[in-house]
Amino acid sequence: LLNRLPNGLFRVCLDLIINYVSGKIRHSFIRILPGDRVKIEVSPYDSTKGRIIYRLHNKDLKDSFFNFTIPFVGIQFEMKNFKKLIFFQEIDSELR
């Protein structure tokens, strides 16, 4: 827990989660590239693994709910419930 925000919200630091693409996305030939915002389901048995279930439309970084900065990787996410997260990963220009 990093800090408390208004309206009962909290800023929480999470570990990076290893994800795989769900069968529907793979079957539909939807391309997921670095920088895309996606919705994931986190496994109830292992919180370090998840599944990408939906690719969201990209928005401006200012519209994000939370913004954590980790060296070389920026992570933004919005908590929907305990099993689903909206997850966005952006590779910093230093890595390109």
Swiss-Prot record:
The keyword Chloroplast applies. Its main location: plastid. It is found in: Plastid, Chloroplast. Keywords: Chloroplast, Initiation factor, Plastid, Protein biosynthesis, RNA-binding, rRNA-binding. Disulfide bonds: none annotated. Residues 18-57 form the S1-like domain. It comes from the Eukaryota. GO terms for cellular component: chloroplast. Pfam families: eIF-1a (PF01176). GO terms for molecular function: rRNA binding; translation initiation factor activity. InterPro entries: NA-bd_OB-fold, RNA-binding_domain_S1_IF1, TIF_IF1. One of the essential components for the initiation of protein synthesis. Stabilizes the binding of IF-2 and IF-3 on the 30S subunit to which N-formylmethionyl-tRNA(fMet) subsequently binds. Helps modulate mRNA selection, yielding the 30S pre-initiation complex (PIC). Upon addition of the 50S ribosomal subunit IF-1, IF-2 and IF-3 are released leaving the mature 70S translation initiation complex. Component of the 30S ribosomal translation pre-initiation complex which assembles on the 30S ribosome in the order IF-2 and IF-3, IF-1 and N-formylmethionyl-tRNA(fMet); mRNA recruitment can occur at any time during PIC assembly. Belongs to the IF-1 family. This is Putative translation initiation factor IF-1, chloroplastic. It comes from Nicotiana tabacum (Common tobacco). The gene is infA.
